[in-house]
Amino acid sequence: ISTSLNGDPLGISGIFITHAHIGHYAGLMFLGHESAATKSLNVFAMPRMEKFLRNNGPWSQLVDYKNIEILPLADQVWVELSGGIKVKPYQVPHRDEFSETVAFEVKSSKKSVLFLPDIDSWAKWKSEYGHSLQERVAAVDLAFLDATFFDNNELPGRDMSEIPHPRIVETMEVFDNLPESEKDKVYFIHLNHTNPARFFTSSAYKDISERGYKIANSNDRFCLD
């Protein structure tokens, strides 16, 4: 990998971790001795997330072998990066068994983005942390939001209240009465494999599109300049 990318393993200069659920940190294993063997790659993490990585294998080996260097994050404190980019974490309510969960605001001199792939509910974000979804989206140019489930009909035989995520139908209701310019910022991400909105031909996808929202797709690129 290093040779094919001119000595820059993976072409990555840093990674920001939202939380310790499988799809959000497991990829760190590929930075290790058996794979990319990166050297002191910057990994930005909140305090509990950092403790989890340092004290649990195989992640601890990444630290011991200096494949990664963990840099601390703090809630609502900007981190200044090169190129005029800065990142701010916002703690959000989620099933925090092993770590905190955060969203990230990413900002350049020209544009800003909210990246929020996992949250229990928008109401809990307001009641527990004082953040309004509408206000946070109003402050950015693009918003990538948790869209794990379209509605409550996706997991037959399971109590979906035990898997809290704002359903897409609920999130659309939050924005439906706002100007088109606000709805146009919203991209739904993090769709579960059961989510019918994954398919262009589904009624769910059609409903989302007709109401002025978008679903992010693999290989989409969004520039901050």
What spans do the regions from the language model cover?
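Cap/insert and terminal regions of metallo-dependent hydrolase folds
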Residues: 112, 120-220
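Active-site neighborhood of phospho(di)ester-bond hydrolases with catalytic His/Asp-centered motifs
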Residues: 11-24, 28, 44-46, 115-119, ...
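Short glycine-/acidic-enriched loop or helix-start segments at secondary-structure transitions
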Residues: 26-28, 54-55, 99, 125-126, ...
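Pre-active-site segment of Zn-dependent metallo-hydrolases
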Residues: 1-20, 26-36, 123-136, 171
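Short, well-ordered alpha-helix to beta-strand connector turns
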Residues: 12, 40, 65-67, 139-141, ...
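Core dinuclear metal-dependent hydrolase active-site scaffold
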Residues: 1-6, 70-136, 220-225
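Active-site neighborhood of divalent metal-dependent phosphoester bond hydrolases
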Residues: 35-40, 48-72, 194-196
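Active-site regions of enzymes building and remodeling cell-envelope glycoconjugates
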Residues: 67-70, 86, 210-215
